[in-house]
Amino acid sequence: ITTRLVGSEMCIRDRQKAFADYLMEVMGLDRSHCGLGETEHPFTLEFNNKDVRITTNYDEHNVASSMYSVLHEGGHALYELGIRDDLQYTCLAGGVSMGVHESQSRFYENLIGRSRPFVEAIYPKVQEFFPQQLGGVSAEQFYRAVNKAQPSLIRTEADELTYCLHVMVRYEIEKQLIGGTLEAKDVPAVWAKLYKEYLGIEVPNDRDGCLQDSHWSGGAFGYFPSYALGSAYGAQMLRRMEQDVDVWGAAAKGDLTPITAWLREKVHQYGGLMEPADVVKNACGDFSAEDYIQYLTRKYTGLYGL
């Protein structure tokens, strides 16, 4: 499986911006309530359920980079936009926890966005935006390229299989920092050591190493495990959703409406009204990582013929 298909030639910047607009339309994001901006590190900023802004970064050599950051941040936006009106301007108006919040972003980015039915559904449009780069690439080739498993330097560009290794590096460093066994000045060296140990990756500089995320500089220590927790929550929600909704039939049409409606009913509307564990239980039963493990096993044994 090669990723050369995704990033072999220059992707015109304006087309990426137009494609991002298209993806937001597919997700059902009302542009009168959800803006899109550009930044170095994608993030979502919410004011209330009528005003949410998402951002992305355009890599002129890789259309998939912005594609999946828009789907990810769009998932955050849908959560905030789906919170009930009567909770607005109270302490219950935001998402209940970052673990649940990341379950929504990674649900749209990976469980739906990297699924074969969804990729096949939107791929004609992808080729329409990028005919020179992807005109001769089949939907199956593109699907395999955006799901290729390989160690990577940047967390936000990691595949689903190796993503949690990036989280583990940060978690180990945070534990040492908070426990007083590691000083901040030594973080770059420990980061490089762990990336080599966990992923076999050489870290070339601090910008692409311990400074690649905005979390620590913003004081968000202890945040990174929420990505792993959210991935597991999302897989469990998907398993339960499949009992109520024709998920893959909808995805194959590029219609995410019934998927978002289910999440809005089971998760979004409650904001912070319930405890995180109760939100998860209400949506899909007691938490277990088993659905996530099974999901990854099925997906990657199929992709690699194992």
Regions found by a protein language model. Name each.
Residues 31-51:
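Long, charged, glycine-rich C-terminal linkers/tails
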Residues 13-32:
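Zn2+-dependent metallopeptidase catalytic core
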Residues 94-135:
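Post-HExxH zinc-binding segment in Zn-dependent metallohydrolases
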Residues 167, 171-306:
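C-terminal, non-catalytic "cap/extension" segments appended to globular domains
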Residues 65-84, 102-106:
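Active-site recognition of the HExxH zinc-binding catalytic motif
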Residues 55-69:
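Short pre-active-site segment immediately N-terminal to the catalytic Zn-binding motif
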Residues 1-7, 11:
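Single conserved hydrophobic/aromatic residue that forms the stacking wall/gate
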Residues 31-33, 86-90, 114-124, 184-185:
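Acidic/polar loop patches that form or flank catalytic/metal-binding clefts of enzymes
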